[in-house]
Amino acid sequence: NEGVSTGAQAALKESEAALGLLADQIRVPEDLVGAVEAALGRHLQLVVTKQATQAKAILQSLSEGKKGRADIVALDLLSGGETPSIDEAKLNEFGGVAALGQVGCDADVQPLLDRLLGRLVIVPDLDAAIRGRAAHRDLDFVTRAGELLSRHGVFSGGRGNGSASASLLARKNEIADLEKELEGLGETVNKHSREKGDLQAEQTTL
């Protein structure tokens, strides 16, 4: 749980109603992790629940036990909203792609992602973001390096000194890659074990 707030950890640990963090509910290509991480920011630590009553109960538990603060979303409050429509063809003029088309998730989480990323365009660099903002003032832009230009004209970016800890999304992808490697190693071991067994069987018959 490195990088996860104390309150979010407590909510996940102590409430069966917590479905997990938003970071665990989405699938992001490796080359877009920096962009999506920057765009979602603290929303990656959203604790996802199905119902508003569950979210309320978790908040009460955190407050009464002084276990920290957390941001919690109730999926039942998100139905019926409209997803902003982005003309993909016009984005090609400055090398942009709609973020929603690049990030995967399960159907029940999609309304949340629609609201968080529905107006977001991923672009190659800040120059492309500025060109895009001039033509589409109702959209937000993020570069692949994680620099933001909001529809309000606000830039966000830069880097601090030292090495920042790996992002939630990057760690999630690393874990998935390791699990695949372990699965592959397990299959290799099983194959060698079968071959060894076959050889031993042949030697026995001889």
Question: What label would you give each PLM region?
Answer:
Residues 1-191:
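Hinge-like oligomerization/junction regions that interrupt long coiled-coil arms in large cytoskeletal
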Residues 190-206:
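Extended alpha-helical coiled-coil "stalk/arm" regions
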